[in-house]
């Protein structure tokens, strides 16, 4: 259900502009493209928390609320929900600002999901989070 009367939750971790090459056959931005932006944004926060490499291990309940158009500004907001021994659970929201299509200036939440990342060592094996690295 769309997030009405709500402001973005978390820190802005990624901001980009949609392009025509990111569209599906209907002319809307691909859901997969939006999901990849969320993954990149979430990984940025997870890497900061882990103090090093992380991998995405799970995406829970991604919900797309509204279509995204060419020329829209896409902002990914993230906040850490919890940490485990090596895992970092992050809530991600995608907020859109319409600057090319109508209604101009509209700001809304287009998608939300929970991403889980795991801190890994140089061999790609899970490693414990350092106590000082946990936010």
Curated annotation (Swiss-Prot):
It is an enzyme of class 3 (hydrolase). Signal peptide: none annotated. InterPro entries: Cytosol_ACT, HOTDOG_ACOT, HotDog_dom_sf, Thioestr_dom. The keyword Hydrolase applies. GO terms for cellular component: cytosol. Keywords: Hydrolase. Residues 8-123 form the HotDog ACOT-type domain. PROSITE patterns: HOTDOG_ACOT. The keyword Hydrolase applies. GO terms for molecular function: long-chain fatty acyl-CoA hydrolase activity. GO terms for biological process: acyl-CoA metabolic process; fatty acid catabolic process. Its EC number is 3.1.2.-. Belongs to the acyl coenzyme A hydrolase family. This is Uncharacterized acyl-CoA thioester hydrolase BUsg_263.
